[in-house]
Amino acid sequence: SCEIHLSGETGEVNSEMLKMFRRFPLKRLIFHRKNTFRDMQSVIASQREVEKQAGIRPEAGMEFEAFVLNEMCQFTGAFCNSLHCDEMGYLCRVSYWLGTVRNGDAVPEKIMALQEQAWDQEPDLKAYDESGYLCGETGCGLCALYQLKQAGITHLKLVGRGNYVDHMEKDIRNLRKALEILDAAENEREFKCTLKRIVFPAGCSERCYYQ
């Protein structure tokens, strides 16, 4: 039979929302990018308690998925006002700067300062490989894997829509490598240090899902 996975593009994810959807029932809940570790842990703990009281075996319980690589969305998915298709650029990727407006015109010195600040935030060119690939260039949650595991996340979402096939292959390999490092690490500090040394030896994009 078919299983229902609730998309990570829903407007809100919390215990009350999950309670409303239990009547369907759901096999998997996908958290969106703005959920904190505490949010996720609270929702998962609430569901696990319901399953325990209902006598549901742990392996048959609801699955929980979180975003881990690519396409960090400043509009939080459900509130996107852009059009996503391969033929047009995404609104969220159009360069812009926020600045003070004076008499209907942007203040020039403020614009210049913000522009320089934006350039400073770009990843170091040395972090890219010879094909122009940088793991997590448009959004990354690999450093958060330890905390996602602690929160009770069972599955990870690697976004691949519109991406190059060879870059997707590298993403999958890097995610596998990160999970191997996670399994071998004794604590979060060891995990992050090893991850940065092996997966990001020249630095990362610093476009973190989970701050």
PLM feature segments, named:
Residues 25-26:
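As written
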Residues 1-16, 20, 30-211:
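Active-site pocket-lining/capping segments in soluble small-molecule metabolic enzymes
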